[in-house]
Swiss-Prot record:
Annotated region (Disordered), positions in chain: 1-59
Gene Ontology annotations of biological process type: translation
InterPro entries per record: Ribosomal_bL32, Ribosomal_bL32_bact, Ribosomal_zn-bd
Any one GO cellular component localisation term in the record: large ribosomal subunit
Keywords recorded for this protein, A-Z: Ribonucleoprotein, Ribosomal protein
GO molecular function: structural constituent of ribosome
Keyword Ribosomal protein in annotation: yes
Gene name per UniProt: rpmF
Protein's UniProt name: Large ribosomal subunit protein bL32
Biased composition annotated in UniProt, kind: Basic and acidic residues: 28-44
Length: 59
């Protein structure tokens, strides 16, 4: 079984845990419809992605 050779300092432990925090997802305003959507995702209401029609729009 692996055992640590040295004690982990509180500073190093905190730096390791700093990446574990959850953050709220980011949203951008769609240029055409003004709706909020995730960046690099399809706008589900219009079906547009990067200026192209990808899906049929929801009614």
């Amino acid at each position: 079984m692996a055992v640590p050779k040295r004690k982990t300092s509180p500073s190093r432990r905190g730096m390791r845990r700093s990446a574990d925090a959850l953050k709220a997802p980011t949203y951008v305003e769609d240029k055409n419809s003004g709706e909020l959507r995730r960046p690099h995702h399809i706008d589900l209401k219009s079906g547009m992605y990067r200026g192209r029609q990808v899906l049929e729009p929801k009614e």
